[in-house]
């Protein structure tokens, strides 16, 4: 079945309204495709992008969320609501425990949270609480990576969830605050029944609006690829009981002599052996944070020089006794 007669957008206009807002206009689409793609991208943007949020809090002198704390203007419920407004971003890890300790008269902001080199606070001026003279606030904040909105009562927690003084928070992980789309009429030569898709997006600053749309598009492509390959099968590396695995596949990815950026991206995804790498698809690798098309092309070229490709399948991998690296 041929589909090359369908129009694809030839005009793509990206307007950066602010560092956290953008408007993307694409045209022309065949009639109906504007709503089809616009709605799919909107739903993915709102629900499926990874982000970071406070998930648990322990406050010195507080037993539960309905307590009050002497010297703090806000009650604990309001303080927790303010805390959930702090936008954070973790680099090279999926969770962290942070501390906020401040005393004396003044305003407590996100800037007062003690962070390491791999934790970034996007809105450091966000107000968390107000302290009166003699007031003191000392808390431990657990930050985790996740997707969408996850109520605290359904999120699995490590250890004893009944620990006195630990408050489990409802977590809004999504870095996208608002997204809407509009479909307008477009024209190409004599055709006037075409669609123009306009997407307005606002993020919390943890992710660039354009990158958010690119990520959502990759997620959609990855999901649709299942339908495109209904009758196809991925190449399989045949392994018989009498055969041993190609020694090349047992070598660490460091032997490929990739750039430091590419090598670090692979290790962050627990890809330590060449055998691990060749089983990943291009789509899967492009979802890796900080790994772009340039790094992907580098990986493909290095593998091709060894007679290997991405998207291969290995039976009985990993082999018994393979040492875990990392």
UniProtKB/Swiss-Prot annotation:
Catalytic activity field: RNA(n) + a ribonucleoside 5'-triphosphate = RNA(n+1) + diphosphate
Keyword ATP-binding annotated: no
GO biological process, any: DNA-templated transcription
InterPro entries: DNA-dir_RNA_pol_insert, DNA-dir_RNA_pol_RpoA/D/Rpb3, DNA-dir_RpoA, RBP11-like, RNAP_asu_C, RNApol_insert_sf
Region span, Alpha C-terminal domain (alpha-CTD): 245-326
GO molecular-function terms, A-Z: DNA binding; DNA-directed RNA polymerase activity; protein dimerization activity
Taxonomy, superkingdom: Bacteria
EC number(s) per entry: 2.7.7.6
Region entry Alpha N-terminal domain (alpha-NTD), spans: 1-231
Listed GO CC annotations: cytoplasm; DNA-directed RNA polymerase complex
Alphabetized UniProt keyword annotations: DNA-directed RNA polymerase, Nucleotidyltransferase, Transcription, Transferase
Protein's job: DNA-dependent RNA polymerase catalyzes the transcription of DNA into RNA using the four ribonucleoside triphosphates as substrates.
Assembly, per entry: Homodimer. The RNAP catalytic core consists of 2 alpha, 1 beta, 1 beta' and 1 omega subunit. When a sigma factor is associated with the core the holoenzyme is formed, which can initiate transcription.
Family: Belongs to the RNA polymerase alpha chain family.
Domain notes from UniProt: The N-terminal domain is essential for RNAP assembly and basal transcription, whereas the C-terminal domain is involved in interaction with transcriptional regulators and with upstream promoter elements.
UniProt-recorded name of the protein: DNA-directed RNA polymerase subunit alpha
Recorded name of the encoding gene: rpoA
């Amino acid at each position: 079945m041929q589909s090359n007669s369908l129009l694809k957008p030839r005009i793509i206009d990206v307007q950066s309204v602010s560092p956290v807002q953008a408007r993307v206009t694409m045209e022309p689409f065949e009639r109906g495709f504007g709503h089809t793609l616009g709605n799919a991208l909107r739903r993915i943007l709102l629900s499926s992008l990874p982000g970071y949020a406070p998930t648990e809090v322990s406050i010195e002198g507080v037993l539960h969320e309905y307590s009050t704390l002497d010297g703090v203007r806000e009650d604990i419920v309001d303080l927790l609501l303010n805390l959930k407004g702090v936008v954070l971003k973790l680099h090279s890890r999926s969770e962290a425990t942070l501390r906020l300790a401040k005393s004396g008269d003044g305003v407590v902001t996100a800037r007062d949270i003690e962070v390491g080199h791999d934790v970034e606070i996007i809105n450091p001026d966000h107000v968390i609480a107000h302290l009166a003279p003699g007031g003191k606030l000392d808390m431990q904040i657990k930050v985790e990576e996740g997707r969408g909105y996850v109520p605290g009562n359904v999120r699995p927690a490590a250890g004893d969830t009944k620990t006195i003084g630990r408050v489990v928070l409802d977590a809004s992980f999504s870095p996208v605050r608002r997204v809407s789309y509009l479909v307008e009429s477009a024209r190409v030569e004599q055709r006037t029944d075409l669609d123009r898709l306009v997407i307005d997006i606002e993020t919390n600053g943890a992710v660039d609006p354009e990158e958010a749309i690119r990520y959502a598009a990759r997620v959609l492509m990855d999901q649709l690829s299942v339908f495109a390959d209904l009758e196809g099968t991925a190449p399989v590396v045949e392994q018989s009981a009498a055969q041993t695995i190609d020694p090349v596949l047992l070598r660490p990815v460091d032997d490929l002599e990739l750039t430091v950026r590419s090598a670090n991206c692979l290790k962050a995804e627990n890809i330590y052996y060449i055998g691990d790498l060749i089983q990943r698809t291009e789509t899967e690798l492009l979802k890796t944070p900080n790994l772009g098309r340039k790094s992907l092309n580098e990986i493909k070229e290095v593998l091709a020089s060894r007679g290997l490709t991405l998207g291969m399948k290995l039976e009985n991998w990993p082999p018994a006794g393979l040492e875990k690296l990392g």
